[in-house]
Amino acid sequence: RDQPRSRGLGDVYKRQRLYRLPVEQVDVVIHRQSIVHSLVEYRDGAMIAQLGTPDMKLPIRYAFTWPHRAPSPDTPLDLLTCGDLTFRAPDLDAFPCLRIARQCAKAGGTACAIMNGANEAAVALFLQERVGFNDIPRLVESALSRVEVKYAPDLPDILEADRQARAAVLQTVGDMV
């Protein structure tokens, strides 16, 4: 999957919920070198970043060994040879799922469950070559317009929203044929 789409649908919502932040305080920054894995800005403006080689072995290893840090057999990041680190704001026209993710996180309720279910169904259809890559955000938005958002949901409400979103994507694709 493309990184900004993945970041929009997963990371914005996870950070917002995990740290109990308003969605306006969670930013996505495009960093093509994939060396800065996370960044926290403090109230005083200071920032702390976690840097590493551009692969997922380290975070996966840490997930399995937490709260300890296991020694890595891999070569560590060398700041003298890794090159420049660049950052830019995402283009919300180029990455519409990021805009959708922000709207859903702000809406609350089952909106994120609808978004996630619709995205998973749309990506599955893309991988089956039944829809184009650029159809994914349109299918997600269509599901969001067709499935009612419930506020203060319980687990059955969330699971039902996911099911309805997946069905809405399949119905929309069926209507396109």
Give, region by region, the residue ranges found by the protein language model.
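Cationic, low-complexity basic patches in intrinsically disordered or flexible, solvent-exposed regions
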Residues: 4
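Catalytic, metal-anchored helix/loop core of enzyme active sites in primary metabolism
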Residues: 1, 10-177
